[in-house]
Each structure stands twice: as C-alpha cells, then as structure tokens.
C-alpha cells in the first residue's frame, strides 16, 4: 500500500505536544530530504476544509456524547481520504497532531463512551489502518492544568476537570500498553531541552 510513514502526536491538553511538533517535523524533514520525501504536517480534528469547520464546532459547542464521537470520525474520514492516504501513496511522511487514539482517550476514557462503539466506528472509517508510530506525551493532569492556565482562553476540552483528564490519560496509557510496538512514551514533565533529547532518540530510531 503506502510507502510513506504515518506518525501521530498524542497527549492530554497541556502535555506540550503541540509545542514540540514543529521542531520534530523540521528535523524529520532534514532527515528525509536526501530521499526527496516531504513531511506533511496536519491535525485532528481538522486538516481539511470540512475538518476545520467541524473542529470549530467540536471544540466550542456543547453536544450529545455520541454526536461528538460521530463528528470526530466524520472529520477523520475526510482527513484520511483527502490528506493522509494521498500523501502516504506519494511516499511522503505524515505527522498529525492527534488521531484515533485521541478519540478513544477523550470520548472513551474522558467522556465514558463504550469502547465497542468507538471500535465499530474505527473499523468503518479506517479499517485496519493505524499509525506507524504514536508519540505519547505523558504528564500528570495537575501539571497539565497549570500549563493550560498560563495560556489563551480555553476551549471546551481544555476547560475539563483534572478528573476528566485523569481518565483520559489512563486510556492513553492503556492503549500504549496494548500496542507497545507502536507507541513511544515521552516524559512530558521534563524541561523543553530534556523532552527534545527524548525526541532525538525517537528520530534516531526512524
């Protein structure tokens, strides 16, 4: 199928993943340049014209739990069809700020939506497709909360309680335990230079 690679960055809000995403992608691009491959940087929800409109709704409007999950997967189907799959088919590498693990963590772990419902949607939308690598930025909810409080006005998810993020983090770690071959866990409690040292090791292994 695809000759490119698909990498995702995951973690609870405030873990710092977005802070390091551009840095990581610049170094990955330098590594791939000799082979003529490009790094496509994208995000979920979002990444397409429709996806960005759905992102605005999902992050700011209250809604039924199942509606939220369905919209997440609708945006994902569009993202796969228009961005991810074509890029991989060209031989490019794709790095996405969140993917399906986030839905299991947030809508499943955080919101409590039954896992079997999410698995049904996952099979329908993406079949057996999974990231080649998921970089999970792991941090305690209390630390993440302090970081979120230091930035802009929070969206709907960023405003959730520490208890919500504790459940979300727990689901992320459970998924990492189930698929250790796919996950690289970054200790996101460390300083920016220390986190980048961890990411350098991830890059070296690619």
From Swiss-Prot:
Stored InterPro entries: P-loop_NTPase (IPR027417), Thymidylate_kin-like_dom (IPR039430), Thymidylate_kinase (IPR018094)
Sites where the protein binds ATP: 11-18
Name under which the protein is recorded: Thymidylate kinase
GO molecular function: ATP binding; dTMP kinase activity
Similarity comment: family membership: Belongs to the thymidylate kinase family.
GO BP: any one term: dUDP biosynthetic process
Disulfide-bond pairs as recorded: none
Entry function: Phosphorylation of dTMP to form dTDP in both de novo and salvage pathways of dTTP synthesis.
This enzyme's EC code(s): 2.7.4.9
Organism: Burkholderia ambifaria (strain MC40-6)
Catalysed conversion reaction: dTMP + ATP = dTDP + ADP
Cellular component, GO, one term: cytosol
Pfam families noted in UniProt: Thymidylate_kin
Alphabetized UniProt keyword annotations: ATP-binding, Kinase, Nucleotide biosynthesis, Nucleotide-binding, Transferase
Lineage: Bacteria, Pseudomonadati, Pseudomonadota, Betaproteobacteria, Burkholderiales
Record gene name: tmk
């Amino acid at each position: 199928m695809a000759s490119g690679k698909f990498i995702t960055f995951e973690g609870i809000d405030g873990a710092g993943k977005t802070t390091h995403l551009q840095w990581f992608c610049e170094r990955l691009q330098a590594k791939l340049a000799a082979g003529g491959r490009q790094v496509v940087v994208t995000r979920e929800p979002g990444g397409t014209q429709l996806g960005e409109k759905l992102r605005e709704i999902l992050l700011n409007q209250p809604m039924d739990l199942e509606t939220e999950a369905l919209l997440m997967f609708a945006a994902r189907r569009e993202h796969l069809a228009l961005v991810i799959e074509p890029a991989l088919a060209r031989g490019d590498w794709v790095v996405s700020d969140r993917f399906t693990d986030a839905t299991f963590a947030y809508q499943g772990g955080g919101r409590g939506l039954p896992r079997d419902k999410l698995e049904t949607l996952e099979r329908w939308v993406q079949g057996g497709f999974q990231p080649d690598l998921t970089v999970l930025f792991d941090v305690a909810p209390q630390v993440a909360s302090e970081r979120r409080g230091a930035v802009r006005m929070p969206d709907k998810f960023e405003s959730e309680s520490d208890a919500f993020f504790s459940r979300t983090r727990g689901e992320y770690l459970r998924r990492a335990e189930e698929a250790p071959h796919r996950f690289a866990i970054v200790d996101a409690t460390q300083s920016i230079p220390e986190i980048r040292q961890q990411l350098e090791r991830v890059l070296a292994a690619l």
